[in-house]
Amino acid sequence: MTALNLIPGQLSLAQLRDVYQNPVKLTLDNSASAQIEASVACVEQILAENRTAYGINTGFGLLASTRIASEDLENLQRSLVLSHAAGVGQPISDELVRLIMVLKVNSLSRGFSGIRRVVIDALIALINAEVYPHIPLKGSVGASGDLAPLAHMSLVLLGEGKARHKGEWMDATEALKVAGLTPLTLAAKEGLALLNGTQVSTAFALRGLFEGEDLFAGALALGGLTVEAVLGSRSPFDARIHAARGQKGQIDAAAAYRDLLGERSEVSDSHQNCEKVQDPYSLRCQPQVMGACLTQFRQAAEVLAIEANAVSDNPLVFAAEGDVISGGNFHAEPVAMAADNMALAIAEIGSLSERRISLMMDKHMSQLPPFLVANGGVNSGFMIAQVTAAALASENKALSHPHSVDSLPTSANQEDHVSMAPAAGKRLWEMAENTRGILAVEWLAAVQGLDLRNGLKTSAKLEQARGILRREVPFYEKDRFFAPDINAATELLASRILTELVPAKLLPSL
């Protein structure tokens, strides 16, 4: 379990990756208390002065002009949570729920939401006890915030709904006991503060970023393996080429390839005097394509790092001035656009890998046996594995269609433009799974191709990648049940073992 002392607004991408991947023991830094208390005092002052303020003593959405009597304020907050818990679909995974909850604690603790410390501490207690509310996967359009999923998260605090602890579902009252809690009664503004925000959208996109980074790292290593398997040239990775263009992502990707390939190997020495002048684009242009993908991940990471530390509640409480101001920080357009751009990168990583696989199948291009197997005709070898890769690459082309350009008005046209950020982030997971499958086939094919090179060795780092696979999957001497091999390679990729072969500084969250 990771220990994390949360200083509001200062979570790093590396910390967020750790929260997603591992249970966390969360504490809130003492520096947060003063601002939290000041925002609560501001809300209480507004009520004492009988001032009208949206979300504090009014209805919501199109009902914002309806003033709520003082005696109904607690019921208003409870009713808000209950009515907005209208999500559908499979439950979000524990890892993602944990990330969502930490993001929500981070935002609330900034002290612009008018929510008491006791409510924030209750969320922290659930996180630390590994009690994860049941949050359905679907039901948010990413404005006004992620209302339905965050309402499901908040239900448990009221003793409603259900939660999962160590893989077992239980009623909210039992779940609260596990965390040493009893049901809360929410004060004015608190229900809205819990529900309003982009934390679900941001968590979805962050998962896409983390998986995309790992796929990027794996694709670098496998692209290097394929260069060696088909007797490709190291010349296209020469630093001078990339410096002349000046694209930072391309320069860094080329440097990573040079690190993986090394200056020379037994394989490269074996064709030093060949007559081939240029390699196909899927080999030669890897730094250009992968560099562009790296730039997309880095830009998305910058946006998501800001959003993870943002206050995306509405209205916001500015305690120093005694003001409560309505705005639109709940609109997750930055997250949606970041996710859309990452979708392009994930699709391109898979597309480029599939082209390299296809190249290895062609004996004229690869100088290897057709479909990487002896006695072709009797044996089909990697023929249909490449077809599988093509199918996955094609799926990703459709999935990469932008979501941020879509919008449907809601709440009787009061909320007339929305971001669709949750859908933009969520489809990244399916795309990542598809690309992982493509890369798994390339890993199998590239190592098979190298093994057909009469015992020649590649560079030290690429030999590591070769050995990792061969410990799980034997050489393909003749046709056998192929799917288990792909599954084994896919599981190795999911373990992030190839990420360790590239410099950590290359990727934002490492």
UniProtKB/Swiss-Prot annotation:
Its EC number is 4.3.1.3. It is an enzyme of class 4 (lyase). The keyword Lyase applies. It catalyses: L-histidine = trans-urocanate + NH4(+). There is a cross-link at A143-G145 (5-imidazolinone (Ala-Gly)). SUPFAM superfamilies: L-aspartase-like. CDD domains: PAL-HAL. GO terms for biological process: L-histidine catabolic process to glutamate and formamide; L-histidine catabolic process to glutamate and formate. It holds the Pfam family Lyase_aromatic. It is found in: Cytoplasm. Its main location: cytoplasm. It comes from the Bacteria. GO terms for cellular component: cytoplasm. Keywords: Cytoplasm, Histidine metabolism, Lyase. Transmembrane segments: none annotated. Contains an active site 4-methylidene-imidazol-5-one (MIO), which is formed autocatalytically by cyclization and dehydration of residues Ala-Ser-Gly. GO terms for molecular function: histidine ammonia-lyase activity. The modification 2,3-didehydroalanine (Ser) is found at S144. Pathway: Amino-acid degradation; L-histidine degradation into L-glutamate; N-formimidoyl-L-glutamate from L-histidine: step 1/3. Belongs to the PAL/histidase family. This is Histidine ammonia-lyase. The gene is hutH.
